[in-house]
Amino acid sequence: MENVITIKAFEDNYIWLIKDSQSQHCIIVDPGDAAPVLTILEDQKLIVDAILLTHHHYDHIGGVDALLSARDEKISIYSKKKLFDRCRLVNESDTLSFFDGKLSLQVMEVPGHTLDHVAFYNDELLFCGDTLFSGGCGRVFEGSFEQMFKAVSRLALLPENTKVYCAHEYTQNNLIFAHQIEPKNKALLNYIQQVSKKRQQGQPTIPSTIGLEKEINPFLRCQQQTVINKLQSHLGKELNDPLSCFSALRQYKDNF
């Protein structure tokens, strides 16, 4: 089993460090800031094998150059777009193997937040950057609502116990909006209480799971009548399909 270590960065970013349980080798996901990563690498005497980049936004890649400068390892970088000279470009359904074959991660192209956005996953772990958050999803900056809807819908098809490692601690704010959409959702009400306790104690709310998100995340619930009814009431018009519902939901959240 691999250990996933949470590294906090900036105000609400999460950088993920995946450590091989049988060695000092590790992988880093979305290192927006090098300083907190280097601290852990030095404290635990870790060797970096690879850096995985979900997309090109600076708060996800800003620490790469400093990490490469500070470490002697021959670190491979994986991304959809050529962001650094050392990048190895990945595409849909590519399989990446690490730690002498003990860890495999597949690539899923999930454009919407950005056009180059990818997720890295297996049946147990999902590193989804800014595509899916706990209780929400990313803003659509470069893609279309249709692309984002397809992206989160594909993620929702992963096994329900898949742990969701997104890149930001947005959960509490997302749940305020989710409660606005489904105020009587019992699973959501329970989760709001759990998240409140964790945040009061300074604990992260991530990882979530796919199963939980399907119960509480309105962006994965666009076929639920409660969500449709709320949006139709808000807009004063009928929504005829899940994509229309998702698009209306994302626009509502953008101005919430």
Curated annotation (Swiss-Prot):
Keywords: Hydrolase, Metal-binding, Zinc. Pfam families: HAGH_C, Lactamase_B. Binds 2 Zn(2+) ions per subunit. One of its GO terms (biological process) is methylglyoxal catabolic process to D-lactate via S-lactoyl-glutathione. InterPro entries: Clx_II_MBL (IPR035680), Glyoxalase_II_hydrolase (IPR050110), HAGH_C (IPR032282), Hydroxyacylglutathione_Hdrlase (IPR017782), Metallo-B-lactamas (IPR001279), RibonucZ/Hydroxyglut_hydro (IPR036866). One of its GO terms (molecular function) is metal ion binding. Zn(2+) 1 binds at residues 55, 57, 113, 130. Zn(2+) 2 binds at residues 59-60, 130, 168. Monomer. NCBIfam families: GSH_gloB. Belongs to the metallo-beta-lactamase superfamily. Glyoxalase II family. Thiolesterase that catalyzes the hydrolysis of S-D-lactoyl-glutathione to form glutathione and D-lactic acid. This is Hydroxyacylglutathione hydrolase.
